[in-house]
């Protein structure tokens, strides 16, 4: 049901049809052994997160819906999971800036603003703030979507990512 509501949202449809974005669900498939893919397989996320990545490397938009399995306190999404989702969204947003289209997190700062409640739809919006060779700086916000009400800002993050020069990341990443 949450996924049906998501794909019906005008903003989702607009992103899906926008040629400036790549649309993907990177954690789908049995071969993916990542942390988030395991959460999807164990139904801790209602659906596999949707990623919309600007081809220009300017940022990304990510949608997801956590279940109560991801609560730290009653009905509050665990902060570690929130930071993981912010890290992934920030990373995917800057990857188009790197020749290999891959990189690693060097620094990630998260500020929690309001409780992120379980069983709600969330959107992360990221923006690349600076690109310098194999280095990228980015920021993003986690928003709780509440139907026709204004979104609630739950967390903010900023990150610094690099494309390593001597590490062939493709050997370390399953596609």
UniProtKB/Swiss-Prot annotation:
GO-annotated molecular function: fatty acyl-CoA hydrolase activity
Subcellular location per the Swiss-Prot or TrEMBL entry: Cytoplasm; Nucleus
Organism (species): Schizosaccharomyces pombe (strain 972 / ATCC 24843)
UniProt cross-references to InterPro entries, sorted A to Z: HotDog_dom_sf, PTE-AB_protein, Thioestr_dom
Cellular component aspect of the GO annotation: cytosol; mitochondrion; nucleus
Chief place of localization: cytoplasm
Top-rank taxon: Eukaryota
One record GO biological process: fatty acid biosynthetic process
Keywords: Cytoplasm, Nucleus
Gene3D superfamilies to which the protein is assigned, alphabetical: Hotdog Thioesterase (3.10.129.10)
Protein known as: Uncharacterized protein C26H8.11c
């Amino acid at each position: 049901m949450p996924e049906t509501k998501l794909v019906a949202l005008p903003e989702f449809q607009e992103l899906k049809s926008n040629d400036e974005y790549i649309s993907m669900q990177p954690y789908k498939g049995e071969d993916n052994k990542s942390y988030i893919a395991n959460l999807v397989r164990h139904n801790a996320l209602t659906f596999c997160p949707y990623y919309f990545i600007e081809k220009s490397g300017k940022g990304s938009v990510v949608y997801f819906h956590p279940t109560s399995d991801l609560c730290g306190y009653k009905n509050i999404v665990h902060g570690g999971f929130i930071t993981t989702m912010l890290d992934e969204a920030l990373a995917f947003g800057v990857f188009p800036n790197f020749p290999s289209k891959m990189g690693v997190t060097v620094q990630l700062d998260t500020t929690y603003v309001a409780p992120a409640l379980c069983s709600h739809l969330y959107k992360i919006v990221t923006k690349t703030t600076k690109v310098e060779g194999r280095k990228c700086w980015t920021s993003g916000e986690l928003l709780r979507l509440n139907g026709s009400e204004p979104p609630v800002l739950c967390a903010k993050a900023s990150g610094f990512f690099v494309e390593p020069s001597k590490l062939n990341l493709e050997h370390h990443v399953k596609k």
